C-alpha cells in the first residue's frame, strides 16, 4: 500500500468509551453479556432456518436467516476488539487493521440496510398482494435479491476504503471512538478533505437516508392497507410492524445522523455507533422471533445429536 508507506502514521489510538478503569471493567462485563447474547441468538436463528426445509423455502425466513448471519458477523468486527481494549491501557489499531474494520463494517452494514429494505418489500407483497405472494417472491427472485444485497454492500465498502486509503496521515492519530470509522479517520488527514467528505456523505449518508425512506414508505402502505381492509390478526400485525420499525430506526437514524452532515467530531457519535454495532444485532433475534410462532416451534424441535450437529426432530 503506497499511501500507507508514505504516511507517518502507522497506527491509530482509540480513545474508547471511557478512561475510567472501574467504568471500563463494568462496560467489559456488560458488553461481554451483549456479545454472548448476539452470538447465541443469531446463531440459533441461522441454525434453525437451515435445519428446517419449510423455513428455508419461505421468503421471510430465508431473508431472516441472512439477516441473522450479517448481524453475527457485524458484531465480530468491532465488539471483540472493544472487549480487549477494556482490559488494557493502550488502545491502538494498525493502519491496515483500521482499513479492515472500515471495509467489513461498511460491507456488512450496507448489506444489512439493503436486506432490511428487501424484507420490507417482502412484507408489503405478503400483506398487500397475498394471492400472488408466492408467485412474486419465488425462490429465484429471493436468491437474486440476496445476491444484490451482498454485491451492493461490497461495492459500497470498496468505495469507502478507496477514499480513505488515498489520504495522507502525518499528524494526530487519536480517534474518539471504540473502532475505526470513516468520519473520524478522514478528519485526521493532513490535507483539505472537503471533496472526500462530500463523496462519503453522498455514498453513506444518502444510502442510509434513501433506504430508510423506502422502508418507511413500505410500512406506511402496509399500515394503510390493514386499516382499509380489516382482517383477522390485524392488531398483531400492527404490533409486529411497530417492533420492526423500532429496530430499523435504531439502525438508520444513527447512520443518517453520523454520515449525512459535515464531519465535525461529536462525542455522542460513538454512543450512536453502539446502536447499529451492538444493540440492534442483539435485539433483532428477539424482535423477529418473539412473536413468531413458526420460528419458536421450529426452535423447540431442534435436537443435538452426539456428534454436535443440530437436526430437526
UniProtKB/Swiss-Prot annotation:
Belongs to the G-protein coupled receptor 1 family. CDD domains: 7tmA_OR4Q3-like. Glycans are attached at residue 8. GO terms for cellular component: plasma membrane. Keywords: Cell membrane, Disulfide bond, G-protein coupled receptor, Glycoprotein, Membrane, Olfaction, Receptor, Sensory transduction, Transducer, Transmembrane, Transmembrane helix. The chain crosses the membrane at residues 26-49, 59-80, 102-121, 141-159, 197-220, 237-259, 271-290. Residues 50-58, 122-140, 221-236, 291-313 are cytoplasmic. The keyword Acetylation does not apply. Odorant receptor. Disulfide bonds join 98-190. It comes from Homo sapiens (Human). One of its GO terms (molecular function) is olfactory receptor activity. The gene is OR4Q3. This is Olfactory receptor 4Q3.
Amino acid at each position: 500500500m503506497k499511501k500507507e508507506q508514505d504516511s507517518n502514521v502507522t497506527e491509530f489510538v482509540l480513545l474508547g468509551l471511557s478512561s475510567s478503569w472501574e467504568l471500563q471493567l463494568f462496560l467489559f462485563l456488560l458488553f461481554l453479556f451483549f456479545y454472548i447474547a448476539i452470538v447465541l441468538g443469531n446463531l440459533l436463528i441461522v441454525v434453525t432456518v437451515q435445519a428446517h426445509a419449510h423455513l428455508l423455502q419461505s421468503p421471510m425466513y430465508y431473508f431472516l436467516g441472512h439477516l441473522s448471519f450479517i448481524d453475527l458477523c457485524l458484531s465480530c468486527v468491532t465488539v471483540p476488539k472493544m472487549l480487549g481494549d477494556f482490559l488494557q491501557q493502550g488502545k491502538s489499531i494498525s493502519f491496515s487493521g483500521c482499513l479492515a474494520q472500515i471495509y467489513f463494517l461498511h460491507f456488512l452494514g450496507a448489506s444489512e440496510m439493503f436486506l432490511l429494505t428487501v424484507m420490507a418489500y417482502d412484507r408489503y407483497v405478503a400483506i398487500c398482494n397475498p394471492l400472488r405472494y408466492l408467485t412474486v417472491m419465488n425462490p429465484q427472485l429471493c436468491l437474486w435479491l440476496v445476491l444484490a444485497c451482498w454485491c451492493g454492500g461490497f461495492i459500497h465498502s470498496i468505495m469507502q476504503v478507496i477514499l480513505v486509503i488515498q489520504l495522507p496521515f502525518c499528524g494526530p492519530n487519536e480517534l474518539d471512538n471504540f473502532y475505526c470509522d470513516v468520519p473520524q479517520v478522514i478528519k485526521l488527514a493532513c490535507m483539505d478533505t472537503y471533496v472526500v467528505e462530500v463523496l462519503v456523505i453522498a455514498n453513506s449518508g444518502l444510502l442510509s437516508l434513501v433506504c430508510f425512506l423506502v422502508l418507511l414508505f413500505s410500512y406506511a402502505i402496509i399500515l394503510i392497507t390493514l386499516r382499509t381492509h380489516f382482517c383477522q390478526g390485524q392488531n398483531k400485525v400492527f404490533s409486529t410492524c411497530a417492533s420492526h420499525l423500532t429496530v430499523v430506526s435504531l439502525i438508520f437514524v444513527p447512520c443518517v445522523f453520523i454520515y449525512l452532515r459535515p464531519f465535525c467530531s461529536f462525542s455522542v457519535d460513538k454512543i450512536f455507533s453502539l446502536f447499529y454495532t451492538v444493540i440492534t444485532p442483539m435485539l433483532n433475534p428477539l424482535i423477529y422471533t418473539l412473536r413468531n410462532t413458526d420460528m419458536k416451534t421450529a426452535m423447540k424441535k431442534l435436537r443435538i445429536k452426539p456428534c454436535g450437529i443440530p437436526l430437526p426432530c
